Amino acid sequence: MDREETLLKLKNNPEYIKELTETDEELEIFIVKNSGNNIKYIENPSKEVQKKAIKNTPLSAKYIKNIDKEIGIICVKSLWNSLEVINNPNEEIIEEAIKTKGWAIQFVKEPSEELQMLAVSKDYDSIKYIENPSENVQLAAIENYYVAIRFIKNPSLKAKVKAVISNGEAINYISNYDLDDIKVFIHQNINVVKYIYESIDVEIVIDILKEKVKEENIEKKYIEDFLELEVLEMDKINFVREYGSKNAKKILVDYKLSM
């Protein structure tokens, strides 16, 4: 059988390559260019054959027993979830997959904290694929976007507070908190009150505010947010004048002058 006849037969039936007593890289490339999945008919494909197959069909990686590192990286960069089908990927392939999409962490058995950090820094919600994330990982995810708290089953207090500081609305995404937690949240971000006003005793809020406004290092934003908090009906200006530190009163004056 001449070359042309062989190519024609391979085109119609790529599995025919297994019947050839002698094959070469050109023939192997020919069948994987038609469909990357045809690499399953090739024993020990060369790096170039792997490359052609992967570029054609990234998920054909599942048919490669010993994928070349460079090819594995090309594969996961092209399609992040192809990591799931790669046999025994090395650390570099895993890392590149996670750099492409944090969700790739779900295909890594017992990922290191370093890989977890990489994942949540890339995509905050990839933390939902991490079982019992450490506090550092929780904080990194929340640093990326506060809504990450929504996907953490048992967030640490520090993680909860970080989310709430970022946005008071974060309290809507925290499933487990108690009164002591709420006091800390309000102390850090008065805007939390917007989302829990109907379920909290106003006197508790007032007590927290008395402690907060007397702090000399109180932030300008906290005072401004307090003054603009419509849901809390009270004489806020006189409250700051009566209970506020020197700095709080200065912020109040500056705020009134800017109106």
Q: What residue ranges belong to the model's regions?
A:
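Alpha-helical scaffold segments
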Residues: 1-259
